[in-house]
Amino acid sequence: AAYITRRFDYDTDGNKIKQEDFSSLAHKTNATHGRNFKYTGSYEDAATLLRSNVAAWQVQMSRFFALVVFNYLFANGDAHLKNFSLQQTSGGDYLLAPAYDLLNTSIHVADEDFALQGGLIPETEYSDVYTRTGHPCRADFETFGRRIGVLPKKMIAILDLFTQEQPEVYALTDRSFLDKKVKRMYVKSYQERLSRFCRK
């Protein structure tokens, strides 16, 4: 079997698009931060990098926020700094690169809720649910959204969308090349994360 995907770091003329991942933007390497450098920091730190490197950061921050929510709901325990990037446009400014490496790692290994060691928000900001259960809920993502500067109406719209169970998740999983057992694991993982997300 082979997996084929279209490269998004080349333009239609075949020219390489300048792209920097967030570990590079943060000047984090194996030499400076150790073997697990790409897992250091928090998603709030990553948002600060975006804000300081993107002129029109507000729209891109909403995209980043939605991606962090997605990664949580779909158990992507490998959403580290090298899996977020900025791309340079033809005008010379920077935008958040298209999402990539979107995996449900829970079907392979027992993962933490977040790939980055600093997690989503400081522990002092945890909701009662997060403190009690050890897992974040919608209220924690609302706190995260406010702290990184997502516009309130946009944040609520994104969270409302993710709060709804999405029938396409089941349809796409069913059509995938995963075997039956792994399909069941994928669906169960999504349902568990969604249930946690919706707790109050």
Predicted regions and their residues:
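Anionic ligand-binding catalytic core segments
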Residues: A1-L81, S85-K200
